[in-house]
Amino acid sequence: MSTEQDIKTEEQIPLTYAAVAAPTVQTEGEAVVAPEEPKPKKNWFTFGKKKAAPTDETNIEEGGAPGDEPVKEKKEKKCWWSRCQKGEGEQKEENIAIGVDLVNRDANSMNNHVQLNFEDIFGEADSQHSWDCVWRLNHTVFTAVRLFIYRLVSLLALPFTIIFAIFFGLLASINVFIIVPLGKLLSIPGTLLAKLWNWLIHAIFDPIASAVGLIFSNFNIRKYGINQETTAPCV
């Protein structure tokens, strides 16, 4: 019986059994370690050299060679006069960052009387119009010249700004450190003197004055003329 069972089990084994490799089990000690790349040796003649820049994939996609340097975007050069001219958006951003309002420079509306434009000064009647180019040129020239003169004078007025800053600083320091402390110091005896004077007026002088007024309130004064005739009483 045993021989027949062995023959049956051998017949049931598939033919590909020998071709299938047994799974290999790796333990923790037998883990495969990747070989380390040898580090380049530093010599005295290669110490100051920089490493080669890595190739840019975007440069290769655009059609450049792998060894070529990456293409850098060119920045627009700004002239010195264009740096002073900033848009309203940039001024608002600087206002948020710095705290100086460069857009609304008259927040308290102190100089609304000088806020005059070309339309507030010049005007043509409906019956008489100049050429459009002439009117446009006058508007441009007036605005540009007025702005240039104002900026030039404001630059020349910098010494006056310094002088007024000195005056305001002196007056503010005198007010803070001398006048206000002196006023607070004098308010202590001044309060006592005010209370004493109020008591003297209401307690002594007021009754005396009211009594004298009641005494002399019934007196009548009559004025006589030259012929000793009585006239109307003068009250």
From Swiss-Prot:
GO terms for molecular function: molecular adaptor activity. It is a peripheral membrane protein. It is found in: Golgi apparatus membrane; Cell membrane; Membrane, Caveola. Residues 29-72 are annotated as: Disordered. Residues 1-161, 183-235 are cytoplasmic. Residues 162-182 dip into the membrane without crossing it. InterPro entries: Caveolin. Keywords: Cell membrane, Golgi apparatus, Lipoprotein, Membrane, Palmitate. Pfam families: Caveolin (PF01146). One of its GO terms (cellular component) is perinuclear region of cytoplasm. It comes from the Eukaryota. A lipid is attached at C234 (S-palmitoyl cysteine). GO terms for biological process: caveola assembly; meiotic cell cycle; Ras protein signal transduction; regulation of egg-laying behavior. Homooligomer containing 14-16 monomers per oligomer. Belongs to the caveolin family. May act as a scaffolding protein within caveolar membranes. Interacts directly with G-protein alpha subunits and can functionally regulate their activity. This is Caveolin-1. It comes from Caenorhabditis elegans. The gene is cav-1.
